Each structure stands twice: as structure tokens, then as C-alpha cells.
Amino acid sequence: GHPAITTAGDLLFGISIDEPPEGWKIPNPEKVKSLVAGLIDGESVRVESSVENIPWIISSDLPISEKGSLSIKVTEKSIKKGERHLTFHPPVLVLGVGCERGVTGNELIELVEKTLGENQLARESIACIASIDLKMDESGIHQLADYLNLPTRFFTNDELESQTPFLKNPSDIVFSAVGCHGVSEGAAIAAVGRGGSLIVEKTKSEKATIAIAKSTSDIDIHKFGIARGKLNIVGLGPGKVDWRTSALTDAIKDSTHVVGYKLYLDLVEDLLKGKECFFSELSQEESRARKAIKLASSGHNVSLVCSGDAGIYALATLVFELIDRENCDDWNRIQIEVHPGISAFQAAAARVGAPMGHDFCAISLSNLLTS
């Protein structure tokens, strides 16, 4: 054999074989070099695809021929050991999940692994997990998503009920429980759209059901359903950059939306590039908390910025009080993470020395948010 410089393939054929589009996976990357070497030597390539739309391959300058001596295979099917084709797994599958409350992640994982194996499907081709919004806070589903390293998307019962004509196994029992005739099949079909198809019908375990649908092209998860929203409640400390926690920095960087008192947002201005920001003046704490909760309940990743520590005379308590008081389904389902910060009393104590080395009591001198 001889070495093949893959950048030569980029220059000659207008395609980066070893860097496919986002979401595509190569299960046998060791085949890349030999294929590129053959192309450089003048050989043609045969393309076998189970997916209709593969423009990044077809529109390239690859010497594609039905009689090519080299081969590229595009498939959602798992490959056998020793597969001779260079294989690509495109993101064209959606895993629909329905379950009873309290199902374990392990039960879901075992059901998915068993079903994928029986149907010879590659987990690398699954673009996301889809379900009904009633299950947005179901820990078992999120454990499955973490295990598969996949995003989740959720639909309302009305959206899933509109898929009833396309279900293979509609259920009146499911309808009486959640308001649609099928969750796993309905969610999978809703995600892939009308051009897609159900390729694995509802499959059951004791407390869960799954189904798998296939799209005709790459799945864009931003075009359907909503994600489970996340609300980060972050304390920025006394204001000095070097007294911020790394958790605060990461939370704001990962957020799409940031809410806070104008002065507090000014203190983290270096982290706000590309974020949608909402601010209000002092004494409007409840409106800020409500805004942050509503944004998160719409599927966004939100940071609510407080001074000091978010849980000490700050907005974390107010957020939990509002959610408890309103008892709104959309609000109850969001993921909340409180990130601690350095409180002003800790900063003042550090300037003095160590006055709080033993038991102590903190008393607020303000009648705002503490009465």
C-alpha cells in the first residue's frame, strides 16, 4: 500500500470524505485512506444508498460509476465485521418513546438495544429521541438520551393525535390516558414528517414502548417539537471577574437566552455575545423570574443572573416559589439548575480575615424578597 493524503481528495473531488456533514457517522474510518488512494490512482466509485437525498456526495466531483471498483455505502443498517465498503450512517432515524411514569433508564436502554439488534439498525443513524410533552421531565427518557448521546424533542398530545391515520397500532387506552392514540409511533412519525415512514412498529417492554421512523433526508431537530427547557439560576458573586465560578461561565456560555438586572448583565457582558438578553430595573425581581421561567418552558436554555449567591437573598427562592404557586404543567417540566456563587458577606469576611470560622447567622437588612 501507499499513503493517501486526504486533503488531496478535497482538492481533486470537492469533498472531504473523512469529514461528512453534521450528524453523519463513519463506522469503519479505516476504509477512508484506501478509498482516497484509489480515487487518486484514477479508479471510479460505486455509491449504494438507502437514503434518497445525499447531495454532498452526488454534487461532488467524485468519479461515480455503477461499475466502480471502489464503493461507498450510505445506510441506516448496522454493518457486519469486515465490511469492505466505506460506510456512512446518515442521521435519518427518530426513536419514538412512550412509557409509564417512573420507568427506569435501564429498561429503556435494554429495549432499545434489543430492538436495534433485531432490526439490524445502527444507533449512529438515530438523530433524536421523540416523545409527548407530558414525559418532558421523565428521568428514564433523559437517561436513555444521555446513554445514546442524543437530543430529545417533545410534542403536544394534539400534535401526536394528528398522526393517528398513520399509526400502525392506535390505542384507545393510550388516548384515554394522554389524549392521543399513540405516543411512540406518533412521535416518531411526527418527527420525520409526511415523506418519512415507520420502519419499526411499536415494540413493548413492561413499562415502555418504542418505535422507529425513517426520513428521506437528514433530520433537522430544530424543525419539529420542542426541547426540554433548562433554567440556570446563576450567582455572579460580588462582581469581580476572578470571583466568578467556572460553572457560572459555562452556564451562560451554553445558554441561548439570558435574563437579569441591567447592572448584573453589564458585569457579564463578555459572556453575552450571540445571546438574546432581557433585563429590567431593580425591584422588578418577580417579572425577571417569570420571564426566565417562561423562556425555559418554551424549550430554551436560559440563564437567570443574580448577584452574590443565587440561593441567598436572591432569585432562586423566588423561582421555586412561583413554580409552586402557579403549578403550571409547562413550568413544572423544565430542568432547573442552581449554580452557587460567592455571597457579599463571604467577600467581606475574606477582607477582614476569618470571622466566620465557626457557627454564624446571616440576617438581611433589606425588606425586599425576605419578608
Residue ranges and their predicted role:
Residues 87, 91-108, 112:
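Glycine- and Gly-Pro-enriched alpha-helical subdomains that act as flexible
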Residues 142-143, 148-178, 185, 226-339, ...:
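Class I S-adenosyl-L-methionine
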Residues 9, 76-78, 100-101, 195, ...:
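Short glycine-rich anion-binding loops that position phosphate/pyrophosphate groups of nucleotides
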Residues 2-43, 225-230, 329-337, 343-371:
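Beta-strand/loop-alpha-helix module characteristic of Rossmann-like adenine-cofactor folds
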Residues 125-132, 303:
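Short glycine-rich phosphate-binding loop at a beta-alpha junction
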Residues 112-126, 243:
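Phosphate/pyrophosphate-binding loops at sites that engage ATP/ADP/AMP, CoA/4′-phosphopantetheine
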Residues 19-89:
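Accessory alpha-helical/coil subdomains and C-terminal extensions
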Residues 68-81, 85-88, 185-220:
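C-terminal edge-of-domain segments
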